[in-house]
Amino acid sequence: VIKCNSKDDWKKYSVTFTADEELESDGSGLIVTNTGDSDLDVDMVSLMPEDTYKGHGLRKDLMEQLEAMHPKFLRFPGGCAVEGQTMDTAWNWKDTIGDVSERKEMINIWNPSATEPYMMTYGLGFYEYFQMCEDLGMEPVPILNCGIACQVRSGSATDEEHLVPMDKLQPYIDDALDLIEFANGTDESNEWVQKRIQMGHKEPFNMKYIGIGNEQYGDIYFERYEEFAKQIHEKYPDINLVTTSGTASSGSSNDLAWNWANEHEELADRMDEHYYETADWFRQHAYRYDNYRRDTNTKVFLGEYASKGNAWYNALSEAAFMTGLERNADVVRMASYAPMFAKYGNTQWSAADMIWFNNSDYVLTPNYYVQSLFSNNQGNYSLPTEVKLNGIEKDDALKGGVAVGSWGTHNEFKDI
């Protein structure tokens, strides 16, 4: 029981309690009731365990599974949430720092329903992500909005609801510059350095990478990216910038991105590729990067990838594919499986996830073990190998069929 005596202003109340009995993993919740005669306004409620990973608020059991992988970097806060359904609902990192109770909530792109929306409290914000990276020995790789909402959902994104005009882009570039100060700055007169210190971290986080955009593509994207890159490189030349090739493993947007990078390699250190494909696709594309350009500054960052499933065959196909990533380490400098976590009963994404969890337990998928094996067993050299199979004949015959057709016209085919 908490006795509230605040009349005209907000007041924070904290209490520690222990449940009388073991709670159901997903069938329990916290209910706040008012037993008094007056009205009670509740602005923000947070329920947290006392024992968290290194005392920084994250579940110890889940973080320990990441720790066992010895991960090298974390790309956050993820994908389409950064973009937003519209620019008004895009992720703004400045809303995610400071006192948790004062952070501005935002609707999440994955369920923007007007009647039952999924809201983000930003309880896990950019400061917590930086702290998580430090606790796990990972490089932070934050992704920022580039002035374009999700193009998959908005199509051409030509109106101001989805596309920031070039003459109004500067505040978004300033957000990127301010983030670098928040993460790396040492001048204690700087507003964003002060905010980091006030949150309890005087020393800089030493961030080395920033991604501009998530899965943006086309000329409207690169026109905006170039403005970000020029200003960031001018002020912070040591920051590695990540550009993006869109939403697919191949096609026009991917081709356009690499053509742009070949002409502007000084503006992009990494090209972020994303693809989710079948297990067979991954097995068949283990040689994907064998023929990528090696004489360019812009290297591959495979920022999101997974085969569509958590079965053993999916994991084995990913492992086969990852041998190609290792073999081409001079081309593919970074790779990150996605998504990393999914809560049972609370996700619209079921194609694949690395770790499933509920309120009390977790399940490590075969995909997790493949990622862990590769992460914990990295070598310095890739040795050429040759496999000879005795008694097995190689069938080089072409298989398949040929079809001809037309659309909306009359045709005659002869001598086929």
What residue spans do the PLM features occupy?
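Surface beta-strand/loop "capping" patches
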Residues: 380-394
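Catalytic-core region of carbohydrate-active enzymes that cleave or remodel glycosidic bonds
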Residues: 131-132, 230-241, 259-377
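Short, solvent-exposed loop/turn elements at domain surfaces
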Residues: 82-85, 281, 412
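N-terminal catalytic cores of secreted or lumenal carbohydrate-active enzymes
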Residues: 1-235, 239, 243-266
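Structural detector of coil-to-beta-strand junctions
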Residues: 29, 354, 401-403
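Extracellular glycan-recognition regions
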Residues: 392-416
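Extracellular/lumenal ectodomain signal focusing on beta-strand-rich modules
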Residues: 44, 209, 270, 304, ...
